[in-house]
A protein has these predicted regions:
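Residue-level detector of anion-binding/catalytic polar loops
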Residues: 17, 125, 157
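Active-site pre-lysine segment of PLP-dependent enzymes
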Residues: 1-18, 22-53
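Short beta-strand-to-loop capping motifs
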Residues: 66, 136-140, 174-176
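PLP-dependent aminotransferase class I/II
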Residues: 43-127
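Conserved PLP-binding catalytic core of the aspartate aminotransferase-like
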Residues: 109, 121-154, 170
């Protein structure tokens, strides 16, 4: 919660920088990604990316907001040409088309909610999500591994999250409705084969 992040920022030594990763901030309603906290703390910086809702992962474009001394220090250590002209042009075009971003968010949220409900109807556990991915939980690590292997055999790549201490889970990016419908069908096939 924002309150927990504020408490964390208050407890940090002044020389320790708290970096807030706002990669998914645009998916939330009334969430500023930490901007208000950055405005009031000298050791907090917030980063954002064009990789998620803007769909520009390959362009490697992002931005940060923080106290002037922190930004000045970052300016001194960054590479001289860290962004290409095409990447900047694409990012500028993307950020000016907020109507498109609004539609993307609405489509993502509707598809994500349908996807979660469909997976739960299959008897699977899913965490609630406010982003562009779903955390699908299985009974155990073995079942998650078997599902991952089955999905790969069908040309579907998802992300194992063992490294986040979630060996029984798979992280699945929300695609368009047709893709998610296909994926629900493939997961249902897997479950039937497990019986």
């Amino acid at each position: 919660t924002l309150k927990q992040v504020e408490e964390l920022a208050m407890k940090r030594p002044k020389q320790a920088l708290l970096v807030l990763d706002g990669a998914y901030a645009e998916y939330g309603d009334n969430y500023d990604g930490g901007i208000q906290l950055v405005k009031h703390k000298s050791n907090v910086i917030m980063t954002r990316t064009f990789s998620k809702i803007y769909g520009l992962g390959g362009m490697r474009v992002g931005w940060g907001f923080g106290p002037k001394p922190v930004i000045e220090a970052l300016q001194r250590v960054r590479g001289p040409f860290n962004l290409s002209v095409p990447a900047l042009a694409v990012a500028e075009a993307a950020i000016t088309d907020q109507d498109y971003i609004k539609r993307c968010k609405e489509e993502n949220n509707a598809t994500r909610d349908w996807f979660i409900a469909s997976l739960r109807k299959l008897g699977l556990a899913c965490d609630n999500s406010f982003t562009n991915f779903v955390l699908l939980r299985f009974k155990n690590k073995s079942q998650a591994e078997l599902c991952d292997q089955y999905l790969q055999s069908k040309g579907v790549i998802v992300r194992r999250v063992d490294g986040y201490n979630l060996p029984e889970a798979l992280r699945i990016t929300v695609g368009d409705r047709n893709t998610c419908e296909r994926l629900v069908g493939v997961i249902e096939e897997f479950l039937v084969r497990q019986e």
